[in-house]
Amino acid sequence: MILEVLMSQSVTIKSNKYGINLILDADMPFADLIKAVVEKFKASANFFKNAKLAISFEGRHLSDEEQQQIIAAIEENTTIEILCIVESGTEQEAIMKEQVEAFNEAVQKQCENVATVSVPEQFYRGTLRSGQVITSESSVTIIGDVNPGAKIIAQGNIVILGALKGNVHAGCTGDRSCFVFALDMQPIQIQIGDLIAKSPDEPQPKHRVRRKEKPAQEQAQIAIAKDGYIYIEPITKNILNSI
């Protein structure tokens, strides 16, 4: 009983309309903390239901791997979908709002585009690992990450509800009007139609990825073709309206 009380006190959830702030005990062993997080979210399951939220962490330094373990534990034991990680701060709720609205806008845009074609959109849930290739005769949505060495080829748009760290080719039949959306945009190579953009670390790219601004932290971004270049930009309603 004492252990259960301590575990319940080791995790505090503060929520707003767009996300959750997870306040964690600084000293509890990480394995026990994971269990406490799971119990806390199970107890709150009726409140969150099928929510799609941003998340932030406070009270304890977490490595990237530990953050991902916590997110995986939440998603595996609830119907919550974590869209992105937001650093804590005074503008936290505003950033969460921006990310969640960007997600909703991108999904809506994808649905509108799919409604105009006869070939159904393809969905894939899970992480694409090195060597895996997905091809689609229409648009494709990945609910997970695309790791280095993985590749997606689609005749339509590509939406990645996770991190893009591999290769993607949208509009593979030559359509430059297609786009690539990712919650965390770190591609090795993006191709839209006949245009190719590689990471600046890659030697002698045909077209460098041009960023109008460098994000201060992970945020949803979209890659579009314009004037013979591929641009990666923070996603906004104006951007979505232009594609």
Curated annotation (Swiss-Prot):
<dbReference type="InterPro" id="IPR005526">
    <property type="entry name" value="Septum_form_inhib_MinC_C"/>
</dbReference>
<dbReference type="GO" id="GO:1901891">
    <property type="term" value="P:regulation of cell septum assembly"/>
</dbReference>
<comment type="function">
    <text>Cell division inhibitor that blocks the formation of polar Z ring septums. Rapidly oscillates between the poles of the cell to destabilize FtsZ filaments that have formed before they mature into polar Z rings. Prevents FtsZ polymerization.</text>
</comment>
<dbReference type="InterPro" id="IPR016098">
    <property type="entry name" value="CAP/MinC_C"/>
</dbReference>
<dbReference type="InterPro" id="IPR055219">
    <property type="entry name" value="MinC_N_1"/>
</dbReference>
<dbReference type="GO" id="GO:0000917">
    <property type="term" value="P:division septum assembly"/>
</dbReference>
<dbReference type="InterPro" id="IPR013033">
    <property type="entry name" value="MinC"/>
</dbReference>
<comment type="similarity">
    <text>Belongs to the MinC family.</text>
</comment>
<keyword id="KW-0131">Cell cycle</keyword>
<dbReference type="Pfam" id="PF22642">
    <property type="entry name" value="MinC_N_1"/>
</dbReference>
<comment type="subunit">
    <text>Interacts with MinD and FtsZ.</text>
</comment>
<protein>
    <recommendedName>
        <fullName>Probable septum site-determining protein MinC</fullName>
    </recommendedName>
</protein>
<dbReference type="Pfam" id="PF03775">
    <property type="entry name" value="MinC_C"/>
</dbReference>
<dbReference type="GO" id="GO:0000902">
    <property type="term" value="P:cell morphogenesis"/>
</dbReference>
<keyword id="KW-0132">Cell division</keyword>
<keyword id="KW-0717">Septation</keyword>
<dbReference type="InterPro" id="IPR036145">
    <property type="entry name" value="MinC_C_sf"/>
</dbReference>
